[in-house]
Regions:
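Conserved beta-strand signature within the Rossmann-like core of class I S-adenosyl-L-methionine
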Residues: 107-114
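A short glycine-rich, Lys/Arg-flanked "PGG" loop and its adjoining helix->strand segment in the class I
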Residues: 92-106
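S-adenosyl-L-methionine
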Residues: 34-67
Length: 176
């Protein structure tokens, strides 16, 4: 969930949808908590539709299962794990996508954004291998928006300000 700017904006605009924000780093969760509280206070609403939790996403099936029927997963600027031996740790790796398939409802979606070219190209292949159809993709999100409303993350702004194009995709779970 990073610093929480993205999830606080998204959740506070969609009070009828419940959100789970996951991070492995306590410091990030602390920042996210403060940002969520500030955003909700600014809008004079209670943060009843969001839960922040510390968890290793590789073990996600310990807390989510088929009957949870998650509709959408957002993966924003995750670690690209560029070294070959570490690629299995990618949040978009086939091995991880297979786990998401368990609790993602049929036609559920993954929204993915990155600045990393190799991670993006590899993720396109991983999606296909894991039984996801890439329904939209762009190699320059700001020139070719594919999301109904793009909420810019801290990393997205930083990379864009450096002239790095943001790659993005929407993938849909399909029957294998």
């Amino acid at each position: 969930c990073g610093k929480g700017q993205f999830i606080s904006e998204l959740a506070s605009e969609n009070l009828d949808i419940n959100y789970i924000a996951i991070d492995l780093v306590d410091a990030m969760l602390g920042l996210a908590k403060r940002n969520v509280e500030a955003k909700y206070k600014e809008k004079n609403i209670e943060p009843k539709n969001i839960v922040l939790t510390r968890f290793d996403i590789e073990r996600i099936l310990l807390i989510l299962e088929k009957q949870d029927e998650i509709e959408r997963i957002y993966i924003n600027f995750c670690n690209p794990w560029p070294k070959g031996k570490h690629r299995k740790k990618r949040l978009t790796h086939t091995r991880q996508l297979e786990k998401y398939r368990v609790f993602l409802k049929e036609n559920g979606e993954i929204y993915f954004k990155t600045d990393d070219d190799d991670l993006f190209h590899s993720s396109l292949l991983y999606m296909e291998e894991a039984g996801f159809e890439v329904v939209k993709k762009t190699y320059d999100l700001h020139a070719e928006p594919i999301f109904e409303k793009n909420i810019e993350t801290e990393h997205e702004k930083m990379f864009s300000d450096q002239g790095i194009k943001i790659k993005a995709l929407i993938a849909r779970k399909i029957e294998k």
